[in-house]
Curated annotation (Swiss-Prot):
GO terms for molecular function: ion channel inhibitor activity; toxin activity. Found in injectable (milked) (IV) venom. Omega-conotoxins act at presynaptic membranes, they bind and block voltage-gated calcium channels (Cav). Keywords: Amidation, Disulfide bond, Knottin, Neurotoxin, Secreted, Signal, Toxin. This is Omega-conotoxin-like CnVIIG. It comes from Conus consors (Singed cone).
Length: 71
């Protein structure tokens, strides 16, 4: 009986700790833009440096389109 109570209290304590840390870590991802650009270039075909591009299509591997050329 005592062991059962100890196990129940331990499980409740660990669950509470996980919920508290999950709320605290929301929105704290570092380098979010860098990570999404990396995923984009890995999942889609992208154009190399100097290729023609449009600013609205985001198809350059570098992520930047200046004056119609990937930079």
């Amino acid at each position: 009986m005592k062991l059962t109570c100890v196990v129940i209290v331990a499980v409740l304590l660990l669950t509470a700790c996980q919920l508290i840390t999950a709320d605290d870590s929301r929105g704290t991802q570092r380098h979010r833009a860098l990570r999404s650009d990396t995923k984009l270039s890995m999942s889609t075909r992208c154009k190399g440096k100097g290729a023609s591009c449009r600013r609205t299509s985001y198809d350059c591997c570098t992520g930047s389109c200046r004056s119609g050329k990937c930079g």
